[in-house]
Amino acid sequence: MIKQRTLKNIIRATGVGLHSGEKVYLTLKPAPVDTGIVFCRTDLDPVVEIPARAENVGETTMSTTLVKGDVKVDTVEHLLSAMAGLGIDNAYVELSASEVPIMDGSAGPFVFLIQSAGLQEQEAAKKFIRIKREVSVEEGDKRAVFVPFDGFKVSFEIDFDHPVFRGRTQQASVDFSSTSFVKEVSRARTFGFMRDIEYLRSQNLALGGSVENAIVVDENRVLNEDGLRYEDEFVKHKILDAIGDLYLLGNSLIGEFRGFKSGHALNNQLLRSLIADRDAWEVVTFEDARTAPISYMRPAAAV
């Protein structure tokens, strides 16, 4: 049986929020079977818990934000991407502020934290959502699609008319039956343009952003001294974001996601369209792990 998975131990980290610039303490804790990923604002009294579910997404400007009443948790996508990539079904994420720390702008530090805490299999079958037929959403020239696929695959294309992007790969497709999330995707950092930063800061966004936690691009070049981690790091980060956004379904996915210039808003719209179309998906479990199409979820393939 493919079993649900949580953390073996509690682990903590400190960082700053990308958009708020606030210092934040992060604690990842094990959680019981069928809990899902739950964000907990421990700076509030009483503590407010917000499950990482598509229907709890309230804002999608520059990041994915979970909302419950007037309480928010910003920038959940990179941590959720790491949870998805390592197959963590159940965990509590405690935060001392309203935003998940940006760390280095990728999912790599979260992968390291989760692996350091250890993975614990639980005595219940892991539930997967299997895509049964195509579901798509569009907005202008942007598009996001789910299609049936016997495994988990994410394809993405970006289209930036900019000197830094013109000579680089702007399309990537990652089939996780043959590709390691940790090695090939998790280290891709978020990116931003110098020309946008002043405006973003006037909107109280990107207040914690720097070359320490993002790829910063000016009119002609990448400003980070060390350059890029992957030749296709820009589009790989969009894949990382999409994996985090898709994990708001609450379960690992069996199917393919295709995005063209899609962002957090359209990704969430796609999840809501899928959930509403009950004939387009089903929940499945695997009594025999050998029959499962997703191998990267198993502990040996997680590293």
Curated annotation (Swiss-Prot):
Protein name as it appears in the record: UDP-3-O-acyl-N-acetylglucosamine deacetylase
Keywords: Hydrolase, Lipid A biosynthesis, Lipid biosynthesis, Lipid metabolism, Metal-binding, Zinc
Any Gene Ontology biological process: lipid A biosynthetic process
Cellular component aspect of the GO annotation: membrane
Broad EC category: hydrolase
GO molecular function: metal ion binding; UDP-3-O-acyl-N-acetylglucosamine deacetylase activity
Function: Catalyzes the hydrolysis of UDP-3-O-myristoyl-N-acetylglucosamine to form UDP-3-O-myristoylglucosamine and acetate, the committed step in lipid A biosynthesis.
Residues annotated as catalytic: H264 (proton donor)
Pathway(s) of this molecule: Glycolipid biosynthesis; lipid IV(A) biosynthesis; lipid IV(A) from (3R)-3-hydroxytetradecanoyl-[acyl-carrier-protein] and UDP-N-acetyl-alpha-D-glucosamine: step 2/6
Swiss-Prot/TrEMBL cofactor(s): Zn(2+)
Record organism: Pseudomonas paraeruginosa (strain DSM 24068 / PA7)
InterPro entries reported in the protein's UniProt record: Ribosomal_Su5_D2-typ_SF, UDP-acyl_GlcNac_deAcase, UDP-acyl_GlcNac_deAcase_C, UDP-acyl_N-AcGlcN_deAcase_N
Lineage of producing organism: Bacteria, Pseudomonadati, Pseudomonadota, Gammaproteobacteria, Pseudomonadales
Name of the gene this protein is made from: lpxC
